[in-house]
Amino acid sequence: MMVRPTILIDMRKHRIRIHKHTLQAIGDPDFVMLIINPIEYTLGIKYGLPDDKLALRIRKSTLRNDYELYSTPLMAALHQLCPEWKERENYRLEGELIATENMAVFSMRDYTVVEH
């Protein structure tokens, strides 16, 4: 059985933690892109290319169990889209893999609150 792609959204630390198995599922990229669809309330993590200005570099030398991305503006945008998310909570999202696109998609309506 394959493990579902998983991310953790930490509103308090303004962080998205992308689990290592999620990165492996989308092709173990050196760069990723985050895609937010506000109409469908989804967040996508896609294999990125180095020449794409929106791609974020994954530093493999520091990668252990997950990749952490810190962004106050991104968290503010997510909070605006999901006002029920509290600023001091952590949210685990399990998504679906779209293998043909090297992408994982997460519904922001389907989450679990994680205790600190």
Q: Which role does the model predict for each range below?
A:
Residues 3-6, 18-22, 30-31:
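Short secondary-structure capping micro-motifs at structural edges
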Residues 16-18, 28, 32-35, 42-47:
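Long compositionally biased, domain-poor regions of proteins
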Residues 3, 39, 46-116:
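Mature exported/compartmentalized surface modules and terminal targeting/interaction regions
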Residues 6-8, 31-35, 94-96:
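Short, surface-exposed charged micro-motifs
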Residues 15-27, 70-78:
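Short beta-strand-centered segments at strand-helix junctions
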Residues 10, 26-28, 98-100:
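Solvent-exposed loop and beta-edge segments used for protein-protein assembly and interaction
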Residues 1-13:
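Glycine-rich loop/turn
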